[in-house]
From Swiss-Prot:
Stated family: Belongs to the bZIP family.
Role according to the record: Transcription factor that binds to the C-box-like motif (5'-TGCTGACGTCA-3') and G-box-like motif (5'-CCACGTGGCC-3'), ABRE elements, of gene promoters. Binds to the 5'-ACGT-3' motif of seed storage protein (SSP) encoding gene promoters (e.g. At2S and CRU3) and promotes their expression in seeds when in complex with ABI3 and BZIP53. Involved in the defense responses to the biotrophic pathogen Hyaloperonospora parasitica and oxidative stress responses; mediates positively cell death. Promotes BZIP53-mediated response to hypoosmolarity stress that leads to POX1/PRODH1 accumulation.
Segments carrying motif Nuclear localization signal: 219-226
Composition bias type Acidic residues, residue spans: 196-206
UniProt source species: Arabidopsis thaliana (Mouse-ear cress)
Main location: nucleus
PROSITE patterns: BZIP, BZIP_BASIC
InterPro entries named in the record: Basic_leucine-zipper_C (IPR020983), bZIP (IPR004827), bZIP_sf (IPR046347)
Protein name: Basic leucine zipper 10
An annotated GO BP: plant-type hypersensitive response
Gene for this chain: BZIP10
Keyword Isomerase attributed: no
Region (Disordered): 1-36, 76-99, 140-251, 362-411
Pfam families assigned to the protein according to its UniProt record, in alphabetical order: bZIP_1 (PF00170), bZIP_C (PF12498)
Keywords: Cytoplasm, DNA-binding, Hypersensitive response, Nucleus, Phosphoprotein, Plant defense, Seed storage protein, Storage protein, Transcription, Transcription regulation
Amino acid sequence: MNSIFSIDDFSDPFWETPPIPLNPDSSKPVTADEVSQSQPEWTFEMFLEEISSSAVSSEPLGNNNNAIVGVSSAQSLPSVSGQNDFEDDSRFRDRDSGNLDCAAPMTTKTVIVDSDDYRRVLKNKLETECATVVSLRVGSVKPEDSTSSPETQLQPVQSSPLTQGELGVTSSLPAEVKKTGVSMKQVTSGSSREYSDDEDLDEENETTGSLKPEDVKKSRRMLSNRESARRSRRRKQEQTSDLETQVNDLKGEHSSLLKQLSNMNHKYDEAAVGNRILKADIETLRAKVKMAEETVKRVTGMNPMLLGRSSGHNNNNRMPITGNNRMDSSSIIPAYQPHSNLNHMSNQNIGIPTILPPRLGNNFAAPPSQTSSPLQRIRNGQNHHVTPSANPYGWNTEPQNDSAWPKKCVD
């Protein structure tokens, strides 16, 4: 248990209220014999009077402030539990009798008339004694070893009149606040990872100036660890920035590829629409061709496909006939024309001279006007009946002159 006592722990039921004097208006002081008190209280009072008289005789009154400062500084230190034995109070009082009850007012053989004042004086004395005992016990215990950092070394707390309580006992709140501030500084300095070079130099100078060689090595190791951690953080930041740059580049390429894909999809859609339009045009042209064939069939009375085949057959049958010096009239067969009346003509009237003039020689063919004038007339008559609006394709199947027809093949 802690040996520090609080004012709230002491209440009125610990001692009885002294009886009211018979003549309160009289100014005659009342002695201790006239007040009925219990034996322990009077014994404690006599003990305090003896201690106060011995303290006054041994020390001057000017040392009261030093005693109060010593009590406040000792009270601000952490208390040690497990030493709550009140049997050693007399031993501590005998050893340090000079420091007891220096802040308490001087008491006399007479007791104050008012019972409340008397109770307050007793409370003050008791609290002073308790504070003295606590200070002696804390002083007898060896303080904890301080850390290597100079910030953790506790400075002696200087008490001021404002920190002293109403009863002359100093409060330990400033010391606790200071200790809390030191611990918070240590925690923040240990948890914080961002240090500047100037702070590192200051810390190194402070640590190397007031520490042992082992502590100096430890501090240097800590500084090197911080520097390595700083370098690693810098490398990580550079890597992160590089990765972010690559990500931005990839995002740009991705956006460009998406644009190209959208353009290709648009072109594909346009091509598909154009293909459908062309297919529709092809179907329309096929329908028009069928209508034209029906019109030709209705006008000519025959299938245009058969007409095209017959014209091709006539072209294949017009082959030249070879001979040495003469051509037979029966060797030339006119083309078959189904709607021509000239086919019934006799072939006797159609002929080509068999003997050429002697001056031209055998290798020269006769002119068309002399050799094939009747045949030319027949062909002209055939073309006259066949060519007019008989071909639906708009081109003539028969040649208009005989210049395209070979008359003789030279050996």
